[in-house]
Amino acid sequence: MDNKNSVIKFENVSFSYNSKKQVLKNVSYEIYEKEYVCIVGHNGSGKSTMSKLLTGILKPLAGTIYLFGYAISRDNIKFLRDNVGIIFQNPDNQFIGITAEDDIAFGLENRKIPRGEIKRIIDSVADKVGIKDILKFEPHKLSGGQKQRVAIASVLAINPSIILFDESTSMLDPKGKKDIKSFMLQLRNQGKTVISITHDMEEVVNCDRVLVMDHGNLIKQGRPDEIFKDKQFLRDINLDVPFSLDLAMQLNELDEKINSTLRYNELIDNICSRVDQKD
């Protein structure tokens, strides 16, 4: 990442609630332009607090958060919120409008975008996330996955450079989870910086880099394959190994030519290749 531009930088950031024990302890890291980063950790690790700091909901007790090289303060909090969009865990917490269309329009109207331009933007983002047929629907008529698509469309409408998913798949059924994970990859491929705070290790497989939190400390970071190769490390901090890798590792114990891999398609190809060789 040496040639990448830093978009977010945490420099020795600490935070505590009501002067109690610190929930973030001297955390430092950088996230780069067009990168897809997952932040993982067990409950109480500090990852949710980090999302509130990233969006300006909370202010660090100590240290500095930089956005595109600018230190974030009360004076430029609008700059932060214009550039960082967030998709929450519970899509119901994000709905403001009477219909899906109204909800997408809300942020645009606040920015005084002309009505004709609002209609064009809504049609564009609705098409991107596949919700053109539900724009007139009321929230209670939508599934969890549809609500999250509307939430994504609402964020895309204001066109932030960075999109933060805060446990955004945890309340969805398998199809809804698959759809949202696919959108994350699409957004990264379209040039957005994507940050996902998650406990879903199957999602982490597809990201560029993982930040591992434990008891308020950033204890490890690296590519998914670097993080997941140490199963004992993950068990020690109460995190799971993705099923595909766990299965591959077990098969590797039976046949050392079956490589440990994070991806199902690679594992299947590997197994088929070994079967063909033995035939």
From Swiss-Prot:
Q: Where in the cell is it found?
A: Cell membrane
| Domain of life assignment | Bacteria
The record places domain ABC transporter at 8-240
**Alphabetized Pfam families for the sequence:** ABC_tran (PF00005)
Bilayer topology annotation: Peripheral membrane protein
The record's note on quaternary structure and interaction partners says: Forms a stable energy-coupling factor (ECF) transporter complex composed of 2 membrane-embedded substrate-binding proteins (S component), 2 ATP-binding proteins (A component) and 2 transmembrane proteins (T component).
- This chain's protein is named Energy-coupling factor transporter ATP-binding protein EcfA1
- Organism taxonomic ancestry: Bacteria, Bacillati, Mycoplasmatota, Mycoplasmoidales, Mycoplasmoidaceae
* Gene name per UniProt: ecfA1
